[in-house]
């Protein structure tokens, strides 16, 4: 079975909302994964597939405007109830992007582009919505050799290598400023769970996720002391001026 057989990202709603609920238990994870992106988050920021906005909470105080985009209106309502100043747009990213602003200083995509068969076309849309000098800030699953039933269940078309992100950036007009692995320990856990046919976050019980949240500073330290292939790649791509 391949991800081509799965319902696409925009319509796998029940699984998506359930995963968002699980991720609410990991505030330290969001702080950690967004930390490398914070220097590039300024001005007007558009976050794609923002969900309930847990990641936005890590940078909202340092930018002038946030536009949260998601296909699920209920998740956006939850986001706006906590952050009334955030503008929300209910948009299917697989369709047209006419409603999205075209003057973003940064666009954030955390675990998004792997859900689109034509990731090049997707990133070209991102390019068109950024100001010259603006940044596409991306997190994607790393290591194609780890591709498994979990990826299929999660609606992933692929996992990424550094070279693939470099090629994708070049083919869409971006300059790759930063590409690096994150979460070395997470990659080891993924290998043990890879035969399970469900979203990765749903393979953990709530108590386990709370424990992981407590351990995030240790995981971050391990990444710094023993860098290596991780569960994810963080990328900072710049639209040339």
Language-model-derived ranges and their functions:
Residues 1-110, 120-123, 202, 210, ...:
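Conserved N-terminal segment of class I S-adenosyl-L-methionine
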Residues 20, 136-158, 162-168:
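Short, glycine-/aromatic-enriched active-site segment of Class I SAM-dependent methyltransferases
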Residues 111, 115:
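A short His-aromatic
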Residues 120-135:
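A short glycine-rich, Lys/Arg-flanked "PGG" loop and its adjoining helix->strand segment in the class I
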Residues 174-184:
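Conserved S-adenosyl-L-methionine
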Residues 186-215:
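C-terminal helical/coil "lid" or tail adjacent to the Rossmann-like core of SAM-dependent
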Residues 191-198, 228-241:
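Core SAM-dependent methyltransferase catalytic element
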């Amino acid at each position: 079975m391949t991800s081509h057989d799965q319902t696409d990202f925009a319509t796998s709603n029940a699984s998506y909302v359930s995963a968002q609920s699980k991720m609410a238990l990991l505030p330290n994870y969001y702080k950690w994964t967004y930390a490398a992106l914070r220097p590039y988050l300024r001005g007007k920021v558009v976050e794609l597939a923002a969900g309930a906005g847990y990641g936005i909470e890590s940078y909202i105080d340092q930018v002038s405007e946030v536009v949260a985009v998601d296909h699920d209106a209920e998740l956006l309502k939850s986001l706006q109830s906590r952050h009334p100043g955030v503008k929300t747009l209910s948009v299917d990213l697989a369709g047209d992007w006419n409603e999205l602003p075209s003057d973003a200083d940064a666009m954030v995509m955390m675990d998004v582009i792997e859900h689109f068969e034509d990731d090049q076309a997707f990133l070209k849309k991102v390019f068109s919505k950024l100001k010259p000098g603006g940044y596409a800030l991306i997190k994607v699953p790393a290591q194609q050799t780890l591709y498994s039933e979990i990826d299929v269940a999660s609606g992933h078309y692929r996992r990424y290598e550094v070279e693939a992100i470099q090629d994708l950036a070049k083919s869409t007009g971006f300059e790759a400023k930063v590409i690096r692995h994150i979460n070395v320990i997470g990659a080891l856990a993924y290998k043990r769970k890879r035969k399970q046919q469900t979203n990765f976050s749903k393979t953990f019980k709530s108590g386990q996720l709370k424990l992981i949240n407590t351990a995030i500073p240790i995981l971050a330290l391990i990444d710094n002391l023993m860098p290596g292939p991780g569960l994810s790649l963080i990328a900072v791509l710049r639209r040339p001026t």
